[in-house]
From Swiss-Prot:
Compartments reported by the entry: Cell outer membrane
GO biological process terms, semicolon-separated: Gram-negative-bacterium-type cell outer membrane assembly; lipopolysaccharide transport
Protein name per its UniProtKB record: LPS-assembly protein LptD
Main location: membrane
Reported function: Together with LptE, is involved in the assembly of lipopolysaccharide (LPS) at the surface of the outer membrane.
Disordered as annotated region, ranges: 54-87
Keywords: Cell outer membrane, Membrane, Signal
InterPro entries the record matches: LipoPS_assembly_LptD (IPR020889), LptD (IPR050218), LptD_C (IPR007543), OstA-like_N (IPR005653)
Family: Belongs to the LptD family.
Span of the signal peptide: 1-33
Gene behind this protein: lptD
Subunit structure: Component of the lipopolysaccharide transport and assembly complex. Interacts with LptE and LptA.
One CC-aspect GO term: transporter complex
Length: 932
């Protein structure tokens, strides 16, 4: 039944029905025993009820066993003899089994009874889930003061004079989305309140409060439940309190309450506080005088805490984290989040370090319809004096950064990536919690504006670098760089006419001041005492300059279902305006006698025609392999390239390097990256690829092999390298390039490449990688890989020259290491469940070239429905710039890392574990993203 409140009086509309009359349409009678009443609104605004004479004799009212309404005396007598109900404080963090053995009173459903959809939202190690039962009105959004009220009970009694209704037996009251249930209820009409007794349940949109007794305000929905337990279904949250108060705004306040995401039978962890407030409207809770209890044992205290109860954002303290290390001592981070608006927010990261002091760090994030980004900054007055004698160190440590991506319209895009730091040792000594800040040797200080037309792209770029190391030479800045690339909008006769153009200024300031190491002694890394690495840069390599490049091209793509043929002609013209200091000019004159170097000219021009023909065929056939049907393809490819020799020794290297040899490099028109070198080549590259494709489109495996045939030597080289001293530049053939990939299924894959040199009958480079991670169980991760490379061209900062091979420095130098840059490594990592809830975590990366372990770690993970623990023993090579010599800065380090994650609160200790697992184990991030 439903009854609207009279418009002139905001009172709870009372309507009681018995048995089969429950939840029927509007009526005006009360059912009490064998009598009926007519009830009308009185002049005073209350109810005026009079007995109604029945038309026919009513049949006897059915008696519900155990549901009779008792008098006050009878109730008191019964209470004296009944067993005292168990208090929630006696359960020590667990749910009360006295209310239901299977915790069904909290809507707990065992895992085996969950539907497939419910299982998908339940953690793999959870024994069940809180499932809100379907009920009438649960999605009702009508305001309380406008909602009709429905009441159902097996037996009812109404006292006309006192206007008190007494209900018994499966009492249900519903108004809007809120529903109250109890064994018995007394409803006081004049006070608009009710008293509920026995198995009390109060439900509202995704929440449930259970107790022994309750007081409820009938017109507002306010309620107080004694000896209460509560559940928030979607957030997997439960708890208890001496009493719980539900406000008119659905906010739940708990006295001496608890909060946890653990299963009903577990007390693995809980927050226990004097006063806990849960606000479903904001998605956050607060608590005062809080102890974090593990197995009901207090392990942490805070006078105040602010925590999420769902995935929404709200201002307040985020879960703190603490750790300890030799660099910082004890460290405590207490982040505070500012939810300023739906589209922008801020986070403050106060970081206390016992050895260094208080680092204040913060970030501001923004999101607009056309852009997104963040500002950040940090400051520390560093108390640690380990580096106080070292050059470039500053005790006033700071960092500022700005990342931005946006579009002024659908064609015009803007980008900013800017980071600046106080000294080059900032990221070696300090950590950052900011999103988007990367710790690397060269920090970007870049801004770009890009316009995308229908057939072209124009870009204005300003790109400088901030050094976060002293063991590298200062790089060139692009101040500015303008590019315009595209194709003409018409294609006469099928011709494609394209163009590439660039105008850029390269500039850098080479340092020449005196350098001291960590102990205050002159640094000998660069040769002479106190010498900067920048002073090893000599000759025209010291030049700054402007570069203008334009490269129009014309091609004729001819395509058919069985293959393609694309002849192409490109003309590259480059102009340089250079400026060089007196030191560089003098050195350039001396170096010009060496055939590997050029001479200095302030103005240079270079023009190079590039002709290529790319062609390929496509064949396929139906075949069978091990009982599986496949479509096998055969895709031969032929590529001819002719680039005449142009002497480029007078041109400095601003942004070029030699690309590594691979199967794909057989079909490139330049073996150098950048613009400062265009390789001379007259070659014919042959390659063939075959694939096995199943009927459903899944590519099971593919294999490619290729080789290039050279018709002349490759004379164009990087400065300091003479082609006659390099065997690979005079060979008639390239190494054989092989690529093989096999996909066991969508979970397993094997990827490999192999480059074998027939002249030296040795492997130039190669790699093999096995990766396993089931799509339906990403908790299993296995990686096994091997890498080998002995054909690198490196820039040696100790000599300021390019050279072939992997040695650091020259023989006789104190820091010389043979084959330092040669790669010969294996990498094995695994995360594997050994028994339910327990997984082993391990990684071993070994360098065979120098016979050393680069990183080794082993440990275990315990994953529970409500918490996770990782304990990992780790050894790694740490890089810390105490001098300019790279090898001298490599030191082995060791640590034991403990990470504890309380689900629903976040990481309490060991957040650093996330970073090295993410960087070191392929598939770890995918595993965590799909974890509960």
């Amino acid at each position: 039944m439903a009854l609207k409140s009279p418009a002139f009086r905001r009172k709870f509309p009372l309507l009681v029905t018995g048995g089969l009359l429950a939840l029927q349409p509007l009526a005006t009678s009360y059912a009490v025993a064998a009598e009926q009443f007519d009830c009308q609104v009185s002049a005073a605004g209350g109810w005026d009820c009079k007995p109604k004479a029945p038309v026919n004799n009513l049949p006897p009212r059915p008696v519900h066993e155990g549901a009779a309404v008792s008098s006050g005396t009878e109730a008191a007598s019964e209470g004296e003899t009944a067993d005292r109900p168990m208090l929630v404080t006696e359960a020590k963090g667990r749910a009360l089994k006295s209310r239901s053995e299977d915790y069904s009173h909290l809507d707990w459903v065992p895992r085996e009874k969950l539907t497939a959809a419910q299982l998908a939202e339940t953690g793999p190690y959870c024994g069940g889930a809180y499932v809100e039962p379907t009920r009438p009105g649960m999605a009702d959004t009508t305001p309380k003061d406008e909602s009709p009220t429905y009441i159902n009970a097996k037996v009812s009694k109404y006292q006309q004079e006192q206007q008190i209704a007494t209900l018994a037996g499966d009492v249900v009251m519903r108004q809007g989305s809120m529903q109250a249930e109890a064994d018995e209820a007394n409803l006081y009409q004049t006070e608009n309140r009710g008293e509920l007794k026995g198995n009390v349940k109060i439900r509202d949109n995704g929440s449930l409060v259970v107790g022994d007794e309750a007081q409820i305000q009938l017109d507002t929905g306010e309620a107080q439940v004694d000896n209460a337990e509560y559940v928030m279904h979607k957030s997997h949250i439960r708890g208890s309190a001496l009493y719980a108060k539900r406000g008119e705004n659905a906010i739940i306040r708990l006295k001496d309450g608890t909060y946890t995401t653990c299963e009903p039978g577990s007390n693995a962890w809980q927050l226990k506080g004097n006063n806990i407030t849960l606000n479903p409207a904001t998605g956050f809770g607060t608590a005062t005088n809080v102890t974090l209890r593990v197995k009901d044992f207090p392990v942490f205290y805070t006078p105040y805490i602010y925590f999420p109860i769902d995935d929404r954002r709200q201002s307040g303290f985020l879960p703190p984290s603490f750790s300890t290390s030799s660099d910082t001592g004890f460290m405590l981070v207490t982040p505070y989040y500012f939810n300023l608006a739906p589209n922008y927010d801020a986070t403050l990261y106060p970081r206390y370090m016992a050895k260094r002091g208080l680092l204040m760090e913060g970030e501001f994030r923004y999101l607009t319809p056309s852009s997104e980004g963040q500002f950040g900054g940090a400051y520390l007055n560093d108390k640690d004096d380990d580096r106080k004698e070292q050059t470039d160190y500053k005790d006033q440590r700071w960092m500022v950064n700005w990342q931005h991506k946006g579009g002024l319209d659908e064609r015009l895009m803007t980008e900013v990536d800017y980071t600046d730091i106080s000294d080059p040792f900032y990221f070696q000594d300090l950590e950052s919690d900011q999103i988007g800040v990367e710790s690397r040797d060269l920090l970007n200080q870049q801004g770009a504006l890009t316009y995308r037309g229908d057939n072209y792209t124009a870009r204005l770029n300003v790109h400088a670098y901030e050094m976060a190391t002293i063991s590298q030479i200062t790089p060139y800045d692009r101040l500015p760089q303008i590019t315009l690339n595209g194709v003409l909008p018409y294609n006469p006769g099928g011709l494609v006419m394209g163009y590439e153009s660039e105008a850029v200024r390269f500039d850098r300031d080479l340092k020449d001041d005196f350098v001291r190491d960590k102990d205050g002694n002159p640094d000998f890394s660069a040769g002479a005492a106190g010498r900067r690495l920048d002073q090893n840069v000599s000759g025209i390599a010291r030049a700054n300059g402007n570069r203008f490049n334009v490269a129009p091209s014309i091609s004729l793509p001819m395509e058919a279902s069985y293959g393609y043929l694309t002849p192409k002609l490109k003309y590259a013209y480059t102009h340089y305006d250079l400026d060089l200091d007196s030191q560089g000019k003098a050195q350039a004159i001396a170096q010009s006698a060496n055939p590997a170097y050029g001479s200095y000219n302030s103005s240079l021009n270079r023009d190079v025609p590039i002709f290529s023909v790319d062609s390929g065929l496509y064949f396929d056939r139906n075949t069978s392999l091990f009982g599986t049907n496949y479509k096998q393809t055969l895709e031969p490819r032929l590529f001819y390239l002719n680039v005449p020799y142009k002497d480029q020794r007078d041109i400095p290297i601003f942004d070029s390097s030699e690309t590594l040899f691979s199967y794909d490099s057989l079909f490139r028109d330049n073996r150098f990256s950048g613009t400062d070198r265009i390789g001379d080549e007259n070659k014919l590259s042959l390659g063939v690829t075959t694939r096995w494709i199943e009927d459903n489109g899944f590519e099971r495996q593919n294999f490619s092999i290729g080789q290039a045939y050279y018709f002349k030597d490759r004379k164009v080289q990087l400065p300091g390298i003479y082609y006659k001293d390099r065997q690979s530049a005079q060979s008639d053939t390239s190494p054989y390039a092989l690529v093989y990939n096999y996909y066991f299924n969508r979970d397993w894959r094997f990827n490999s490449d192999f480059n074998w040199d027939p002249d030296s009958r040795s492997t130039r480079s190669g790699s093999a990688m096995f990766h396993y991670q089931p799509e339906d169980n990403p908790n299993k991760v296995v990686n096994l890989g091997y890498r080998y490379r002995n054909d690198t061209i490196i820039y040696d900062s100790t000599t300021g020259t390019w050279k072939e091979g992997g040695s650091y420095g020259n023989p006789g130098d104190p820091n010389y290491i043979k084959d330092y840059y040669k790669i010969q490594q294996h990498d094995f990592s695994v995360i594997w469940p050994i028994v339910p809830q327990w997984s082993v975590i391990a990684r071993w990366q070994h360098d065979y070239n120098r016979n050393r372990t680069l990183e080794a770690m082993g440990g275990f993970e315990y994953d529970n429905c409500c918490w996770k623990l990782r304990l990992i023993n780790r050894y790694w090579i740490d890089y810390d710039d105490f001098s300019q010599a790279l090898p001298a800065n490599e030191k082995g380090d060791h640590g034991v890392f403990l990470q504890i994650v309380l689900k629903g609160l976040g990481g309490v200790v060991g957040n650093k574990v996330e970073s090295f697992l993410d960087q070191g184990i392929q598939g770890y991030r995918e595993r965590e993203d799909q974890a509960y």
